[in-house]
Amino acid sequence: MHLKTILLTRPSGANKSLADLFRADGLSPIVRPLIELAEKPVDLEMKRIALNLDHYDKIIFVSKSSVRFGLPILENYWPQWPISLEWLSVGPGTAEALKQLGVVASFPDLAGSEGLLALEGLQEVAGKQILIVRGVGGRELLGQSLGESGASVTYLE
């Protein structure tokens, strides 16, 4: 019997659980990290966004990496988080990364942008200010959908 092969290109250290799942399904994963995550220096736009955190109604983290790189930028300017800010994440892994840093975030049962967009808290967003924390050039579905629903979307990337 010949196993089907799948190439995993996620950053180093991020492939093990996925490789294990594929192996359990009878696939033969090859791990070749082709992506390297690096911290982007804080620029004036990032600083402006961080300083205005209290102007946002909701903040969404799209990955564990967005927590790792984005949350410290915000923490530099906010020793205590704005009380009215609603925290959201795309799934349980990202929510857990936030929780380990003292932030409780809502997340959907179905992880991902589509699941997040189905949450009750994102159904009526017209006039809301939403900050999405993501990597440079991340997926557009979340921001586009929220914008089409009348929200004002800003990216911290």
Predicted regions mapped to residue ranges:
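Signature of uroporphyrinogen-III synthase
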Residues: 1-157
